[in-house]
Each structure stands twice: as structure tokens, then as C-alpha cells.
Amino acid sequence: MDLAAARQRVEELRRLIEEHNYRYYVLDQPSISDREYDALMQELIALEEAYPELRTPDSPSQRVGGAPREEFNQVRHPQVLLSLNDAFNEGDLLEFDRRVRDLAGRPVEYVIEAKIDGLAVALTYRDGLFTLGATRGDGQVGEEVTANLKTIPALPLRLRRPLPFLVVRGEVYMPKVAFTALNAAREEAGEPLFANPRNAAAGSLRQLDPKITASRSLSLFVYQVISLTGAEVATQAGALDFLAELGFPVNPYRVVAPDIQAVLEEVKAWTPERRASLPYEIDGLVIKVNDLALHSVLGATAKAPRWAMAYKFPAEQATARVEGIILRVGRTGVLTPTAVLTPVRLAGTTVSRATLHNEDYIREKDIRIGDTVIVQKAGDIIPEVVAVIPERRTGSEEVFTMPERCPACGAAVVRPPGEAAHRCTGGLACPAQVLEGIIHFASRGAMDIQGLGPAIVAQLLEAGLIHDAADLYYLKEEDLLKLERFGQQSASNLLAAIAASKKQPLERLIFALGIRNVGQRAARVLADHFGSLDKLAAATVEELTALPDIGPRIAENIREFFGEPRNRAVLEKLKKAGVRLEALNAAAPAGPLTGKVFVLTGTLPGMTRQEAEELITRAGGKVSSSVSRKTDYVVAGEKPGSKLDRARELGVPVINADGLRQLLRQ
């Protein structure tokens, strides 16, 4: 393919991918499968790698990339991003309406919108291209998070209609499903949990490494035009329609209310059940004057506009009695305590269980069996015990202690130093760990075996048809037909999905194995470096820790995993079953920087961080986020950070952008 043909195909692929992004994330009407979408993206990436001159900042391939940053730059907003005054009851809303009508001198129409519980951001577009994204901060100054925002698939990198200049305001949020999955993964790893989706969204967007942000499944709703050149909007309802036409994700809930009485009726219609049914968290409603011309008439205080008010939902809490505390054993052996409660209605559902996270949480709140406690849904999702009512105690309450033996297999339970979690040491001899491990192996982010959910895995284990993940590849149709709810078609579909998973990339297999602390990013690093499972299994701790982002703890976990005879037996069965154990690019040619580890710091003249990282990796080098004795070069640009000081302390060679170019030419 020559350059002209490549350019034409790249433009076509970009148009197709952005159209599918719009249909999926904005319209919620996907028209192709995930596999078809991935094929388009991989073709685009391959063409841009073959023809680097065709790569542009607004290409869909550029959503994820760039080296980790040392700190965020401060950005002054061109217009102050005010917060909102809160209303907690009908009287507050009536008083708001009275003030608005007094200042306006006439009846006023309102728009009611959902108050998304996330992190406010300002997005700037020039000539239709996304050029700058910043957090709200204190309203006047925020943090520049452009690279991180680009990783959110719902955010358009190019508007569907080019405008000279546009600044909009939106809310980055984490869907409930993503929040539950993130906390489950953190709990398994013994890491602190996020209290609610809002904290998770804020913490994920403010990661110095955009790749971590990309892994957190963030989404976005845009709800306000701050500054606009090249078009006009007259009402807030019209502004929302205008934003949707430009390709922004706009929340589907919107009600135009002719007066405050209609607003009050709509507020009453928001039952706990309705709120709980949403796939994302809202903590209230926002009532805005619809006529934008009135906004300047009404003005603002130093803190908030006079033309809007946030109605906050009352907290959803209930009291319940702790009937008992049970333990769930996860795939890595983490024991998670759960309170068994007297059933109570909360946020539209009946709650009879609540997470207690770990022993430290139980001790901190002094939760005992028999206590009367206050329960709430953290982010309307996970019920948790937030407080004990000590005056309800009778003296018969029991203090809970973590067991010395695993309730599932009887193996010893230990609490590793520096971790909040207690772990079962039974490994693959523990049936609970085997169950959770196979569920993880088949999950979407791992081997992606469609149709193999937790219930079917449990069924297969109970029937003795499988004992580990590798046994899945030896199942026969007659085995499945013996099970309940399995017919000819469902058995055939599952076996086809299992067979298809044999061709998954090596990085997915490494992640699927469930090695402690080896997430998707670490799995990718390991697959890229070693190229095969056999080479990874033979790697020493020293070889592993020489890799970017593989620390001593992960290295020890990898060695421990491959040193376990049961795990080696599983790997042998996978190999015999025909599961791909090698990377497709295992024989990639060496380059001038092969084996060299680089760290980037400061602003590099003539190239972006992302471009520098790509040049290094294409030449066979590795880019790390931190300086160590294993770092070969630190590439320092303007205004370098603490990494330069660390390099000097360790005697690591420091070069500039020209020095990097010279190495690349060797």
C-alpha cells in the first residue's frame, strides 16, 4: 500500500471508529460487535505505525498513550467555574424561585437535570479539536488532565461540527458496574477501597499515568456551554440539544418545567427505586433557569450562580441488627468479612448483607455480632455498615476475630506484613479459590469465554467435570448435556467460546492465570518482554525487577506462582490443549536501544512525551516511570522534576532530546 492509499484508508478508519464510538457511548445504539470494533482499531494502529506521518493528535488511536507525568500543571479557567447552592427541601426550592422571579420581574421556566456525582471538568475545543481539559479545582485554577481525559471513549476528540472556539463543562463519573469491579479487584489485592464512585472517578482521573486512567472505565456527561464562537444558543434545553449534535454525551434525563410547582412534582417523582435503577450515581437534581439571557441578568454571588440550584437527595440509611459475620474467600485467598443483617429496605432494594471489608474496618468501628448498626449503600451500590449504635447494646454481643483456618479448606490463614487483608494459604487446594480463579480466568478482561459465568463454573466443579481452568479445554458435549439447563445449542455455543479463547493474546493468558498483583498492565509488560509463557516461567527475580513497573513484590509473586507444582501442571495441560502460550510478536526485530531502560522527565523540545516513548519502544528500548540503578538513561527536558535529582544521586547518565536522537541514529 502506498502513502496515498494508506492516507485514504486511515481517514476512513478514523471516521468509522469515531462513528461507532458515538453510536456506542452517546446514542447507546452499537451497530458492530466488540471484535469488529477491535479489528478496525488494530488496523488503524498498524497503518499509523507503518506511516508515522499520518498519525495526528485527534486520531482514535491516541486516546491511550504517553509516559507517566511527574505532576499536573495548573490551568487558570478563562471563566470562573462556580459551584451551586444546595436545596434540601421544598421550602428551599420555593425560596429560590421567589428570588429568581423577583430579580427577573416575570414568570420563569426551568430545566431539571440529573446531578451526576463525579468530578467536574472543563473541556476546550479549537477549530473542532479537543485541545485542553482541566479539573474544576477551586473554580479559578484547576489541574490540566488532557491526556487522561483523552482515554475516556465517550469524549469526542473532534466535534461533529467544527467550531472556532468552544469551552464546555461536564462531569467525569464511574459507572456502578465499573466501581464494583474496581473495588473487588482492590480488595483481592489487599489495597484500600474507594468509598464511593465519585472518589473512584476523581482518583482515577488524577492518575499521573494515563494508562491507569484508561483502565478504570470512566465515562462523561457534558451539560453546560461556557464559551462559544461560531454559533448561538438561547436556552439551556437548546444548549443540551446543541451539545448532543456536536457529539458530546448528554444525560438523557431532562425535564422542562413551566414553573416551580412542576419542579416540585418532578422532585417528588424521584423515588429511591428510580434512583437505584440508574447505571451511574446521582446525588440530586439541578434546577436551572432555561432562558440563558436571564443568566446574565440574575448574575452570581462569589460562590454560586443565582440562576441555578442543586436539590440534594436525603441520605439513604437504615438500622439493622448484625445476625452474624461470614467470610468469602476470593481467588487470591483474601478473606472478606460480610455482615448478615436483619432484612431492611434501602434505596429501593431489600438489604440483608453488608461488606465489612477487613479486620481493621471491623475493629475501627467496633462492630460486633448482635449490634444494631446504621447501614447505607456506598454510592447507592454496595451496602456497608457505617456506624454502630452503642446505646442499643445489651451485653450479649460477640466480638468477631478472624479465624486461624480457612473456612473453605482448613488451610492456615495469614496476614502478610503491610496488608490489610487476611489470606488463605491453601492455594489450588482451596475449593473457594479454585472457583473464583476459574471465574476470573473466563472473565471478559482475561480469556473472555462468553457464556461461562459463575453459576456454570460452580455447576462444572460440583459435577466433577473440571478441577482447574485448564480442564475447560477438555470438556466434551456429552459432559455438558448431563447438566441442568444445558441443551444441544447451549452446549455447542459454550464449547465454541472455549475453543475460540485458545487464540487469545499472551498478555490475556498471563492476566487470566491470576498471579497476585499482576494486573492487565503488568501482564502486557511481561508478554512484550518474554514473548512466551515458558520464558516467563524461567525468569529470575533479577530479570523480572529489571522490567519497567515490575517491582520486587510482583517478581516474588511470579516466581512463587511458577514454582508451585499444581500451577505447573495446569500450564502443561493448557499447552497440550493447544492454548496459545507465545506472543504473536515474540520474534520482533532488535533495535539500537534493545535492552536499554529510559526514564523521561521535563518538557522535551521538538517532541511530546508520547512521541519520545514511541521512538524508544520502536527502537527496542523500554520506558519506566521511576529511576533506579537499572535505569540506563534519564532523558531530561525543560523544567525537569525530582527524577533528575534521583538520577544524579545514583549516577545514571542524563541526556537531552538531542542525545536521545543521537542514540536512535546509531
UniProtKB/Swiss-Prot annotation:
Residues 588-666 form the BRCT domain. One of its GO terms (molecular function) is metal ion binding. The active site is at K115. GO terms for biological process: DNA repair; DNA replication. Its cofactor is Mg(2+); Mn(2+). Its EC number is 6.5.1.2. NAD(+) binds at D34, R35, E36, Y37, D38, S83, L84, E113, R136, E171, K288, K312. Keywords: DNA damage, DNA repair, DNA replication, Ligase, Magnesium, Manganese, Metal-binding, NAD, Zinc. DNA ligase that catalyzes the formation of phosphodiester linkages between 5'-phosphoryl and 3'-hydroxyl groups in double-stranded DNA using NAD as a coenzyme and as the energy source for the reaction. It is essential for DNA replication and repair of damaged DNA. Belongs to the NAD-dependent DNA ligase family. LigA subfamily. This is DNA ligase. It comes from Moorella thermoacetica (strain ATCC 39073 / JCM 9320). The gene is ligA.
